[in-house]
A protein has these predicted regions:
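Core segments of cupin and vicinal oxygen chelate
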Residues: 1-51, 74-81, 89-100
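Eukaryotic phosphotyrosine signaling hubs
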Residues: 8, 60-64
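Short hydrophobic/aromatic beta-strand micro-patches
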Residues: 14, 66-70
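Short, charged/polar surface micro-motifs in flexible loops or helix N-caps
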Residues: 58-59, 72-74
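Short, low-order "capping/linker" segments at domain edges
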Residues: 100-112
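Short beta->alpha transition motifs characteristic of CBS
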Residues: 115-119
């Protein structure tokens, strides 16, 4: 099977406590500028969205690493062929029903790993 395209998307940092999250966001504002911090219901994003600071924890002992792929089905098949099991229960879908995200079943070096179709 031909290897599909994979690109680094972002690293997710799990919240230790609300105070620690606040300190990380403050530090990122210092480095990247206040305008580069976006907030969502579950996380803050910094560094051109390459850093995700989770609110209330997240997957992975140390956090997570995300990889963008333009062809999620091919990427999933490729990883499964290479011996990596996917966690079907972790799949997230767009409103039109197409899958946009899925995690590997097992962590790698303490990090959860997910594939995403969003840059």
């Amino acid at each position: 099977m031909e290897k599909p395209e994979f690109y680094f998307s972002h690293v997710g940092i799990n919240e230790g406590s609300p105070k620690e999250t606040e300190e990380m966001v403050k530090f990122c504002r210092l480095l990247f500028g206040a305008g580069d911090i976006q907030e969502s219901a579950h996380a803050y994003f910094a560094g051109d969205r390459t850093m995700e600071i989770q609110k209330g924890g997240g997957r992975g002992r140390n956090g997570h690493v995300a990889f963008y792929t333009p062809d999620l089905k091919a990427a999933m098949a490729y990883l499964e062929e290479c011996g990596y099991e996917l966690d079907a229960s972790s799949a997230k879908y767009e409103e039109d029903g197409t899958m946009r995200l899925i995690y590997l079943k097992d962590e790698i070096n303490g990090f959860a790993v997910h594939l995403t179709t969003r840059k």
